[in-house]
Each structure stands twice: as C-alpha cells, then as structure tokens.
Design a protein with these regions (language model features):
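Helical segment within the ABC ATPase nucleotide-binding domain
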Residues: 84-98
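Signature (C-motif/LSGGQ) region and adjacent switch/coupling loops
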Residues: 8, 42-45
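Conserved signature/switch motifs of ABC ATPase nucleotide-binding domains
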Residues: 44-47, 65
C-alpha cells in the first residue's frame, strides 16, 4: 500500500490508472469496503490499519478493476487464524461472483484445498510444475468443509504427492 494514500485511495488506485471517474471508483470501493467489513476505515492511512485490514484493502484493490487474472502471492500468510478464515471466506465469495481468475500461491495445504480448483506443485530450479492435483469439491466451500471426509482425503493425496516429490 502507498503510505501517503488513504485506504480508499489505495483501493481505487487501479481504477484511477484505468481512467475511471472519481465518483464511479469511490462508489465501487465503498461497496466493497462494506462487503469486506471495513466500512468506516476509508479515510485511514495504512499505518492506522491492522495487518488484516491492509490485506482486505489489497484484496479490494485487486478485484475492483475486474482483471482477467489476479495473482495472490501468499496473501494470508502473516494473518492470525481467525482473520485468515474470515478473509478466505470473503475471497471465495468475491471470487465466485466476479468471474476473475485467481492464481493463488500458498504453502498451506489446507488453504490450497479449501480455495483452489486445481493445485499445481512446483519443484526444481527454476521452479517448474512437477505435479497437479484437481480439487473437485463443490462450491460454495465453507470453512467447516475442512473437516469433511472428502476434504481430508484430498489433503492426504496432496501431502502424499508432496512427500513423493521430495524423496
């Protein structure tokens, strides 16, 4: 986030670069601030926001311009468990309703199985795709799904594949 911009200005940055009118971009951003549970923080600067709030603003900034593909590189790694679960569910909802493709990078197998339709495992130098695991779980995917037998079987399969690749 740009430290000299408010949370709203940061969220609207991509739309601003695309030439969207100020009223249009602020309307879209404020709607997403409400949806992501951070309404009322639009005027705050990054140093005034928690790590979770900053991640929500970054997620809004990514989705607001509706790109064809959004790269998310370990966006939840530094978050506490509750905030991570909340943001995972918010991401799943946004993702499902937006039509935006997401390339999600994570080292967390549970997170990958919950969020992704397909897991690609990388190895070697430079990193190349060495294995793939489709995730045929139905959507929507509530956090409680992580306790279902099918989820746990998929997780076991991914972990076994990772062990196989390591050996």
């Amino acid at each position: 986030m740009f430290p000299w911009m408010t949370a709203l200005e940061n969220a609207c940055f991509g739309l601003r670069m695309l030439g969207a009118e100020p009223g249009e971009r602020e309307f879209k951003a404020k709607e997403l601030f409400s949806r992501f549970g951070i309404a009322g923080w639009e005027s705050a600067y990054p140093h005034q926001l928690s790590v979770g709030m900053k991640q929500r603003v970054a997620t809004i900034r990514g989705f607001i311009s509706r790109p064809d593909l959004l790269l998310m590189d370990e966006p939840f790694a530094a978050l506490d468990a509750q905030t991570r679960m909340d943001l995972q569910q918010e991401l799943l909802e946004m993702w499902g309703n937006s039509g935006v493709g997401v390339l999600f990078v994570t080292h967390d197998v549970d997170e990958a199985v919950l969020l992704c339709d397909r897991i690609l495992m990388l190895g070697g130098k430079p990193g190349t795709i060495v294995a793939e695991a489709p995730i045929p779980l139905p959507r929507p995917r509530p956090a409680e799904m992580a306790m279902d037998a099918e989820f746990l079987n998929l997780k076991r399969h991914v972990l076994a594949e990772m062990r196989r690749l390591r050996d």
